[in-house]
Each structure stands twice: as structure tokens, then as C-alpha cells.
């Protein structure tokens, strides 16, 4: 087993925990796994009670709202992603925030990046293996079916899927607003 700074910090962070030695070992393993795989720049804004389960990469200037759960999100490009409150991001979600300029002075594309940030509203659910293309905006309460390729704007409460993602249904707005007013939010997940 290789050791590194993540092993040291995993031991330091778990040494004083009032749990059994076996439980401490399990926690250390999870910490080591997450230390190795996380790339979150110092100027990313992370709200309260945000949970990451596995590897994620977030670009500088990105933000995550309170009580959001992320299993595995990879933000690529030089743009940012803004994720609202109480949203859930499933595994292997790719968000591409910039693209090469194919109308530039070189072919097949120029060195210039065209940056288009991505926005995900509050109370959204992004399914596994979804790809969010530059400039995507997902409205409050929308659901994106797993495996979708999303470009453009998805309206609030829409349920969409496919390649390219198309809206095929809407959530019940009355029920959604009632649950929201009552504060009935999905508790930030524990994926074990």
C-alpha cells in the first residue's frame, strides 16, 4: 500500500473519534479514497451540508448550494458551474463549460476557448452519466434522465431525457410547491 499526505491526514482526522478501531479503519479508507480523487479549487463556493461521495472535479469560480449531494461530477473547460440548493447529482456526470472556436483562424478549430457557464437550479436531479454541454441552464425542480446529453435551457419542473435531451413531461407544480413550502426535502444522501 502506498502512503502519502492523504494517509497522514486520514489518521490525524480519525485518531480521536470515539468509535471502534474497525469503524475508524473504515472511515480512514473512505477519507483516503476521497482525498486522492477530489479536485476542488480554493475559490469554489460550497454551501452548508454539501456531500460528495466519490471523485469530483470543480473549476475555479464554481458554486454549490446548501444541502446538495454529488456522487461524481467532472467539470471540464475554463468556465464555471453553479448548482442550486437541495440538488442531487448522480454518478459520472460530465459538465463541459467551454469549447474550441471552430470559426477561428485555424482548422479544425482555433486555440481560443468559447466559454459558456452552466447553471443548475434548486431542487434538481441530474441522472447518472449525463453530459451537460456549454451554456446549459436547468430550471428549478427539473429532472434530467440518466444518459442524457443536455444543451440549451430546460424549463423549471421539466422532466427531460435523450440525446439531445427533450422535455417529455412536467412535475406536478402544485405538489412540488406544497412540498417546498412544507420544507419536505430529500435528506442529503448516504449512498452506502
Model-derived features: where do they sit?
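Terminal amphipathic alpha-helical/low-complexity segments used for targeting or macromolecular assembly
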Residues: 1-36, 86, 93, 99-105, ...
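Short beta-to-alpha loop/turn elements within the nucleotide-binding domains of ABC transporters
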Residues: 62, 136, 147-148, 154, ...
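Short linear elements at protein peripheries
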Residues: 2, 17, 21-67
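Conserved catalytic segment of ABC-fold P-loop ATPases
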Residues: 139-142, 155-157
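A generic "structured core" feature
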Residues: 84, 133, 143-149
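Conserved active-site beta-strand element of glycosyltransferases/polysaccharide synthases
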Residues: 160
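Flexible, glycine/small-residue-enriched loop-and-beta-strand segment within the central core
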Residues: 51-137, 171-172
Amino acid at each position: 500500500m502506498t502512503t502519502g499526505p492523504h494517509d497522514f491526514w486520514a489518521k490525524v482526522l480519525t485518531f480521536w473519534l470515539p468509535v471502534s478501531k474497525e469503524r475508524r479503519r473504515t472511515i480512514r479508507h473512505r477519507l483516503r479514497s476521497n482525498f486522492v480523487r477530489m479536485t476542488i479549487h480554493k475559490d469554489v463556493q460550497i454551501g452548508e451540508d454539501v456531500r460528495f461521495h466519490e471523485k469530483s472535479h470543480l473549476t475555479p469560480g464554481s458554486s454549490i448550494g446548501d444541502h446538495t449531494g454529488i456522487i461524481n461530477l467532472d467539470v471540464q473547460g475554463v468556465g464555471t458551474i453553479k448548482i442550486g440548493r437541495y440538488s442531487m447529482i448522480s454518478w459520472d456526470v460530465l459538465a463541459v463549460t467551454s469549447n474550441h472556436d471552430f470559426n477561428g483562424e485555424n482548422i479544425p478549430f482555433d486555440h481560443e476557448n468559447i466559454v459558456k457557464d452552466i447553471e443548475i437550479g434548486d431542487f434538481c436531479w441530474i441522472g447518472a452519466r449525463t453530459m451537460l454541454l456549454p451554456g446549459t441552464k436547468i430550471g428549478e425542480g427539473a429532472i434530467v434522465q440518466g444518459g442524457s446529453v443536455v444543451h440549451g435551457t430546460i424549463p423549471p419542473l421539466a422532466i427531460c431525457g435523450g440525446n439531445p435531451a427533450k422535455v417529455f413531461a412536467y412535475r406536478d407544480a402544485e405538489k412540488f410547491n406544497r412540498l417546498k413550502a412544507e420544507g419536505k426535502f430529500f435528506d442529503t444522501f448516504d449512498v452506502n
